[in-house]
Amino acid sequence: VRGRMPTMEVVNERFARNIRVGLFNLIRKSPEVSIGGIKVQKYSAFLREIVVPTNFNIVTVKPLRGSALVVCDPNLVFAVIDALFGGAGKYHTRIEGREFSPTENRVIHRLLQTIAAEYAKAWVGIYPLELEYQRSEMQPQFANIASPSEMVVTSSFLLEIGDSSCSINLCFPYSPLEPI
């Protein structure tokens, strides 16, 4: 299970370039994107690394079996909302103790559509992979895509949008990706 994953490295490089353009087209601000790395780890270990509350998006991975997670840092959600509504990126919102509002959820859905489209483009020529939105959660116990002991492949991307530092984490069960 351990070792380099050259296919995922290529996909992540492409996705980092693609998401920069996709986010610019969405918010008209050019984010800085850097790749945080690829890890193969237990699902429980991945969940422990995520600061809650956060935005867990469960997606179907077509044509593979099973689901994956697209985890958007709340700072990313608020940076996108701020940019969409003409803000300068100076105001920082806190999510603790509340759910996302209907407006915030709509923006999250648009953000996820952008992420899914750019991620599918990153797989072109390698494998015809698509992410299809299922639902969003705020707590990890409701975002089960694998058993706690199951191995997952995680990729993290660090973004700078204005004064905001934020991240996107992608988490896939290892077994469906292994043949690719």
Language model features with spans:
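N-terminal auxiliary interaction/assembly segments of multi-subunit proteins
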Residues: 1-180
